[in-house]
Amino acid sequence: MDDWIDYYDSTHTIYVSKLHRDVHFRVIANDILAYVPSPSAVVLDYSCGEALFAAGVAAACQKLILAEPAPGVRGRLTARFGPNPKIEVRSLDELQPLPNGSVDLAVMISVAQYMTPAELDRAFSLMRRILKPGGKLVLGDILRPEVGAATDVAALLKLAAKNGFLTDALWGLARTALSDYWQLRQSIGLQRYGEAEMIAKLKAAGFSPSRAKTNVGYNPARMTFVATVPDLADKKPETA
């Protein structure tokens, strides 16, 4: 994951324009809002990126923790949201002191593809510990093995046409093809998971998971999973 952290901490070309970046984060924020369980909830956004519209998510909950591994991005988050008393910015290492069962909702959106399977397992273990019984982990934008880059390009162009940055998207795709992003994608690769594989991975971490009907974000070819921490208090005792 370190190489990808360095990439996103640089002046990268993953977004074809400012409008693309804004639309991307607005779509994700709106989708996250649908999962916030109550105004009293504590929400964690793991590897949140720029999280431009996090203030809207924070307004719907009691506390929003933005956890980001890239130091430069984390600095911008602190500058952007520092005055907001409902938002707390942390590094990933700073999540370790969080008490057991202190979070109602955790989201990991478009993150798993940049992590090794072992790194993802460690993140799941952390989430399982800090989520309350009945709390949920929303794992979004999971790449499927059978879906290639052409599908991602088509999803981007559809989003661009809908939101008025199609020309920028076409030029941006040409630039990105020659950028460090594609070099990294070809040399390191992106992690992909089938539905059954991810369900098994989440079950092994102690969750009760299922695939959501729709993906978080704008790419319907990718998958979102909702993994619930079992509430043992609600489990009916077995009868003889």
Residue ranges and their predicted role:
Residues D121-P133:
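A short glycine-rich, Lys/Arg-flanked "PGG" loop and its adjoining helix->strand segment in the class I
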